[in-house]
Amino acid sequence: MIPFPQGTHRAADEKSLPRSIIAALPRTYAIIFYSTDLRFGWAMLALNLCVPWIGLAGLAGVLAAACLAWVLQVDRGWIRSGFALFNPLLACSAMVLAGMLGGWAPGVIVMLWAAAAVFSLLLTIGMQGWIGSRMGLSVQSLPAVIVVCLLHFTGVGSGGQQVVAQVASATSQIDLLAMPDVLQGFFRAFAAMVFQSSAGAGILVYVALVFSSPLGAVMATLGYVAGAATLWMLGLPMGATGTTWCGFNFLLAGVALGAGYQVPNRASLLLAVVGGGMTALVAVALSVWMGWFGLGVGALPYNLVVLGVMAALRLLPRPIGLIVSPWTTLQPEGMARLMQISALRFPHYYQPAVFLPGAGERVVTQGFDGALTHRGWWRHALDF
């Protein structure tokens, strides 16, 4: 069953911009965790607003991108689903955060915020058309990563500095300093999903995810643990000091590979673990390369791993144990439940079925490997 009701869709709503925006808001925030739960989306929106300027910048970016997409006549269903708007949300929030931490001039921050909203929307539309048509995959948050990296240089070139301070958060007052360092790193990875750095915010995000999708929370946990363990084997600290800069990539890879694109099962659980470890390796490599340009890795490691792994799996006829999810509007629990029901109703679904074209006695007039026809792909055909 779906944990929470997803709401009904009315065709008349597609003609109303305000109604479409209201429908898109919770989906835009929930889709970051590959969730379709509306209550979880509203919770993520509220947690984003715990850092008012960052949260409002992201919300305003979503509204601006929705209006622009409406004017450009982007598919209304794509707007309402949040797929067209979550990259502007991420890009606008990240640009304002970078501007506040770097001490950029207010006018520069506003200009780059507007550029992030427009560029990320257009890049999402363009890249989704290309990636979707060739690999059948979502563009992920790759447009936001590209836009933020490029506009970051604009801000620095205007006289701004690199990250020099921390932004105050309403949840920083509930940070638990006595918490073990490993747990600090774990919850701070979840806090980074709402552009915060306190373990208290991470606890709230994690609790919301557990209530929304227990399977999604399991996959995120496994992805993070695998990534943090990989960093530890590379000689880096496993706690907050060693994972805060990239830990959210691990949990996103776990959710995407374990419960986003695949129906949750034992094989997808293993894929989530492998994906988390691969993301850690890619993150370390990218940190060296991007450090030359004064950039952090952002969400690039997770994007590269998820797109690379899923593109490879798309080329396989049927990966052992993995079942590609045929539904994009269900929670992981709903997908798993429907697959169990389908397996009981159609136990031989994946076995080929051969039926004769008629009943009774028939005469075969031409058999296998005919001299003139029935060659190549058709060599096993029979004429009756």
What are these regions (language model features)?
Residues V110, R134-P143, T243-F248, L269, ...:
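Loop-to-transmembrane alpha-helix initiation sites
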Residues I54, G58-V74, P88, C92-S93, ...:
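Transmembrane alpha-helical segments of multi-pass membrane transport proteins and ion-pumping complexes
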Residues N48-G61, G103-A116, F186-S198, M238-N249:
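Structural signature of hydrophobic alpha-helical transmembrane segments
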Residues L142-F195, P326-A336:
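Long hydrophobic alpha-helical segments that form multi-pass transmembrane helix bundles
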Residues T328-F384:
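Surface-exposed, glycine-biased beta-strand/turn segments
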Residues D75-L90, G136-S138, A217-V218, L222, ...:
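Short, non-helical or kinked segments that cap or interrupt transmembrane helices
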Residues M1-V74, V148-L151, R188-Q196, G200-S212, ...:
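N-terminal signal-anchor module of multipass membrane proteins
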Residues V51-G55, V71-F83, L101-G107, I125-L137, ...:
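Membrane-helix interface "capping/anchor" motifs
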